[in-house]
Regions:
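N-terminal Rossmann-like NAD(P) cofactor-binding subdomain of oxidoreductases
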Residues: 1-158
């Protein structure tokens, strides 16, 4: 991780989609974060502005391949990929990298629930990134892998 005086380096996988674009917008505006890499498998080589024309100041970024080689070397990686695509990629990222998964791949603790709602194989759950839940803050402390809650559960829980 960067020293306290250096900005935190960030990468966003799935930057061409809605959630990835919002993450890019928020990171670009953050004074202590340097957005270094944006990825989108189906749009490699496109400027970010081709998919996110509203993102002024970072539209010239070129979309890179969504793979572990491209994403490694950043302090934090945001995975804004379709459900079922984050788990394999996250498993190939260095353990010291903070990874936040916006998909459902690591949200559910029950294999039965995962298979019912999403299909496919279930992977191990990560701490749920909603510190307002009882006991969640302690699980998040020091975690290097975090499952970002979706909008519906967040609204229902809060």
């Amino acid at each position: 991780m960067s020293s306290s005086s250096d900005p935190i380096t960030a990468a966003v996988a799935g930057a061409s989609g809605y959630a990835g674009g919002e993450v890019c917008r928020l990171l670009h505006a953050h004074p202590n974060i340097s957005l270094r890499t944006v990825c989108a498998s189906s749009s490699v080589g496109d400027p970010l502005s081709a998919h996110q024309p509203h993102l002024h100041g970072i539209g010239e970024y070129v979309l890179a391949p969504t793979d572990a080689t491209t994403l490694s070397g950043h302090d934090v990686v945001f995975l804004a990929l379709p459900h079922g695509h984050s788990a394999e990629l996250a498993a190939r990222l260095p353990e010291q990298t903070l990874v936040l998964d916006l998909a459902a791949d690591h949200r559910l603790s029950s294999s039965e629930s995962w298979e019912r709602w999403y299909g496919g194989s279930h992977v191990a759950p990560w701490p749920y990134g909603l510190p307002e839940l009882a006991g969640a803050r302690a699980k998040l402390t020091g975690a290097r892998r975090i499952a970002v809650p979706g909008c519906y559960p967040t609204a229902a829980i809060l």
